């Protein structure tokens, strides 16, 4: 596989969780959480991370329903992805994010993270789950 660092995003109404892969695009790790508003500032921060980290692709979580249909947030995420893609010099794609926030919260609880700290970390952990699922799906497409 070509060496390429991939950024994963969990875009929420208030915050955007950010995760990053290793250069071999095998392992995802939480990176940071940035405010979602104003969107222009969030996009500028993401663009800066892409440039600083040598990111070759961005993966954004797509909120699907349990039936695999576009959820109520999907249109807003699509607008964000379109605006982000317009300023980046790398591909931006969406990937199913079903249940990632639930999994992230459970993971943090299992690690003994105090409830007050979970809110600070949940978005970037969810982004790392989205990105890891994406990386795994690329390696094992079936």
UniProtKB/Swiss-Prot annotation:
GO terms for biological process: rRNA 5'-end processing. It is an enzyme of class 3 (hydrolase). It is found in: Cytoplasm. Keywords: Cytoplasm, Hydrolase, Nuclease, Ribosome biogenesis. It holds the Pfam family RuvX. HAMAP family: Nuclease_YqgF. GO terms for cellular component: cytosol. Its main location: cytoplasm. One of its GO terms (molecular function) is nuclease activity. The keyword Nuclease applies. This is Putative pre-16S rRNA nuclease.
